[in-house]
């Protein structure tokens, strides 16, 4: 089971929106060197809705090949079409990804039975461990804990990323999930709380700019060193908050750019961070000790 801080890595782009694959490789090295425990590539933060299928597959392949087994690579393979999700998951397996992260289908609003059949079909079609991803703030459809736990019994479905930020729901999953079913928060703000209670890790946006701190925070929370986890939490608290001052990944891409790690490119319909919010994100980077 993968534990700790798992970065939901951004996808570097030039200012014209084209992929910057050299910066992408450098970012992968940066995370390996800074202690990130695993990498999710082409997830929400990686702008999966605005890369085409060819680019999506290219990014997965580059990540797997460049990381070369140094840490696990989890491929974002979700889609609002079951057939497309299966195709992406099949590619991830062939590319050598360790796992797939598959988001709840968005826009078409499936029922709980539809969600069950969707993820079951993926797991049955491809022999690659699948992590479910529930983020109702984006997908509208909200996968219930009952459906998650029903899917936990399906061979090949090995965990869930719960991005609801709801502690009550997290506690219910901890109490009822099989012991070998991985529980990850997708909400940095509640990472210390959920990991302290029994979650296994954090699939993190903040880790894009503070990988070492997020790794240390997750390790401290998991080991019961609440004083250290609390200290780091408050050091990065403004990042947890202000990296969402506009829609993710707008603020975090600007922040990674300010650290000198990539150009300031993003694809429409997303636009770069507004001038009004730039001082806010810069102040959060300063509070975390990441810039002077």
From Swiss-Prot:
Keywords: Amino-acid biosynthesis, Cytoplasm, Diaminopimelate biosynthesis, Lyase, Lysine biosynthesis, Schiff base. One of its GO terms (cellular component) is cytosol. The keyword NADP does not apply. InterPro entries: Aldolase_TIM (IPR013785), DapA (IPR005263), DapA-like (IPR002220), Schiff_base-form_aldolases_AS (IPR020625), Schiff_base-form_aldolases_CS (IPR020624). Coiled coil: none annotated. It comes from the Bacteria. One of its GO terms (molecular function) is 4-hydroxy-tetrahydrodipicolinate synthase activity. Pathway: Amino-acid biosynthesis; L-lysine biosynthesis via DAP pathway; (S)-tetrahydrodipicolinate from L-aspartate: step 3/4. Its EC number is 4.3.3.7. GO terms for biological process: diaminopimelate biosynthetic process; lysine biosynthetic process via diaminopimelate. CDD domains: DHDPS. It is found in: Cytoplasm. The keyword Amino-acid biosynthesis applies. It catalyses: L-aspartate 4-semialdehyde + pyruvate = (2S,4S)-4-hydroxy-2,3,4,5-tetrahydrodipicolinate + H2O + H(+). The record marks 44, 107 as: Part of a proton relay during catalysis. Its main location: cytoplasm. SMART domains: DHDPS. Catalyzes the condensation of (S)-aspartate-beta-semialdehyde [(S)-ASA] and pyruvate to 4-hydroxy-tetrahydrodipicolinate (HTPA). Homotetramer; dimer of dimers. PANTHER family: 4-HYDROXY-2-OXOGLUTARATE ALDOLASE, MITOCHONDRIAL, DIHYDRODIPICOLINATE SYNTHASE. This is 4-hydroxy-tetrahydrodipicolinate synthase. It comes from Dechloromonas aromatica (strain RCB).
């Amino acid at each position: 089971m993968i534990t700790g801080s798992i970065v939901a890595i951004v996808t570097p782009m030039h200012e014209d929106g084209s992929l910057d694959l050299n910066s992408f490789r450098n970012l992968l090295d940066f995370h390996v060197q800074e202690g990130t425990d695993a990498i999710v590539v082409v997830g929400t933060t990686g702008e999966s809705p605005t890369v085409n299928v060819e680019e999506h597959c290219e990014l997965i392949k580059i990540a797997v090949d460049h990381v070369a087994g140094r840490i696990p690579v989890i491929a974002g393979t979700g889609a609002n079409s079951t057939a497309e999700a299966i195709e992406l998951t099949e590619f991830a397996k062939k590319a050598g990804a360790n796992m797939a992260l598959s988001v709840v289908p968005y826009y078409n609003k499936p029922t709980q039975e539809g969600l069950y059949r969707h993820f079951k079909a993926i797991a049955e079609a491809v022999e690659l461990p699948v992590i479910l991803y529930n983020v109702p703030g984006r997908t509208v459809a909200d996968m219930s804990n009952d459906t998650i736990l029903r899917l936990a019994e399906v061979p090949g479905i090995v965990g869930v990323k719960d991005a609801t930020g709801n502690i009550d729901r997290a506690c219910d999953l901890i109490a009822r999930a099989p012991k070998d079913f991985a529980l990850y928060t997708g909400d940095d703000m509640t990472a210390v709380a959920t990991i302290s209670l029994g979650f296994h890790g954090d699939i993190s946006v903040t880790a894009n700019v503070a990988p070492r701190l997020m790794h240390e925070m997750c390790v401290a929370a998991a080991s019961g060193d609440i004083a250290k986890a609390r200290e780091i939490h408050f050091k990065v608290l403004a990042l947890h908050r202000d990296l969402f001052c506009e829609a993710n990944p707008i603020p975090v891409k600007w922040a990674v750019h300010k650290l000198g790690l990539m150009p300031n490119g993003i694809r429409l319909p997303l636009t770069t961070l507004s001038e009004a919010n730039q001082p806010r994100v810069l102040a959060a980077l300063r509070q975390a000790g990441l810039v002077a």
